[in-house]
Amino acid sequence: MNGGYGMQFDVLREFACHDNAEVVRLNAYVAYDTARAEADPNYAEGQRNFHSSLRDFGYKVIQKDVKRYTDAEGTAIAKANSDLDMAVDMLLQSEKLDRVLMLTGDGDFVQVVRALQNRGCRVELVAFENVSSELRREVDMFIPGWLIPNLLPIRGAPRGAPAWGEIGSRVRGVCYYHKDVEGYGFMRFLDRVDADLWISDTRRKDSPYKTAYFHDSYLLDHLEPGEIPNRDIIFEFDLHRSLRNDGLEARNIKVVARL
């Protein structure tokens, strides 16, 4: 999965049950390079530990061996393709499911999504970078993995740092409102995961989202005029107590992904 390195699979499992759902099956499709494992004991041990951790969290590990071939231009390519296995498993297992959560950005799954929906399944999508726009339109809900609290740890966060959403913590969100001339805007971030992920209006008390004001001087990356607001640009920022009111303020704002 592009952009998802370091993902916390225990957090992913919790997210899959965000509306008190019961897990029926957790499939993890992993690539394994047999040739590299034979030559590199550290790689082999690391993969075994990773697979064991997945099983500890309740995932069924489906291993796909890396295959090497040379293309028409003479370029050596290593690839482990699990798309077909994933599609077949979803179709076969969907008879006993109310909802399917997919982690992929591959547009080849559009027809699979339609087939699942025609069977009465709700299909939700979590992805990071290089996400097919057609796949995003087809699913019942799409959420960038960057925005799920603690799914992808904040790089460089010190030990003992405030928890996601607390004052002094660093979170990820999107800019949903911005005034170019005045030079300010508002970020929205997911504060908690629950059954009401559709309630994005932070004025509602039951919304799992929160808003943080920001001034353009806190933007660490250059953005062209009119480039924000844009929900396809993921920002990472520090949360501070606002000096203007009792709300939140975003500082040290950095672009971490563009979908």
What is the predicted function of each stretch?
Residues 218-236:
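Short nucleic-acid-contacting surface segments enriched for D/E, G, S/T with interspersed K/R
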Residues 194-218, 249-251:
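A short macromolecule-binding patch
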Residues 240-259:
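OB-fold/S1-family single-stranded nucleic acid-binding modules
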Residues 180-201:
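Short aromatic-glycine-enriched beta-strand elements
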Residues 1-82, 107, 122-130, 229, ...:
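Domain-level signal for Mg2+-assisted phosphodiester chemistry and nucleotide/NA-binding surfaces
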Residues 166-181:
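Structural detector for short beta-strands of small beta-barrel domains
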